[in-house]
């Protein structure tokens, strides 16, 4: 029910896309029965971590932990040949691991899924061109932005040295 309430609130605040603010979520008590993840590399938490603002990141996690019975630090890993992306990802993962362990929070390994199978990448790029009126698709830093099976995700967890990430 709480997830439906959040979805309804997000559509009531529709501006180009459905949206709901963190303040609304925390004030509404809608997170209490949900598993809350901290989000992808572009999330509020991870922007703070990329800027080395661990103090504000801890404050944010404390607020989320008070609103939810189950909070986990979400981690994502994507292979890339781009050195700048790899440095950013490595630094972010380091911050995420440190923060999760220091606050006693579990890690949740997810994959940034933009399409269902690896073979769908071209179709997804065509969709982005059509939907957003671009001449070219969006360049993704890294690879593997599709729905991976549990064996592939366990492999990523092992590679990252985090076999207990769920």
Predicted feature locations:
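Phosphodiester-processing cores and adjacent nucleic acid-binding clamps
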Residues: 1-166
């Amino acid at each position: 029910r709480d997830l439906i309430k959040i979805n309804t609130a997000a559509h009531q605040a529709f501006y180009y896309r459905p949206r709901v603010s963190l303040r609304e979520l925390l004030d509404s008590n809608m997170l209490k029965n949900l598993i809350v993840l901290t989000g992808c590399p572009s999330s509020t938490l991870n922007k703070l971590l990329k800027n080395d603002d661990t103090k504000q990141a801890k404050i944010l996690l404390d607020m989320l932990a008070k609103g939810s019975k189950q909070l986990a630090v979400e981690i994502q890993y994507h292979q890339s040949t781009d050195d700048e992306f790899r440095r950013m990802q490595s630094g972010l993962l380091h911050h995420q691991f440190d923060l999760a362990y220091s606050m006693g929070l579990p890690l949740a390994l997810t994959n940034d899924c933009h399409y269902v199978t690896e073979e769908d990448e071209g179709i997804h790029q065509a969709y982005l061109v059509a939907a957003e009126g671009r001449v070219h698709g969006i360049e993704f830093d890294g690879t593997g932005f599709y729905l991976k099976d549990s064996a592939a995700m366990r492999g990523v967890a092992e590679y990252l040295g985090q076999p207990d990430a769920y």
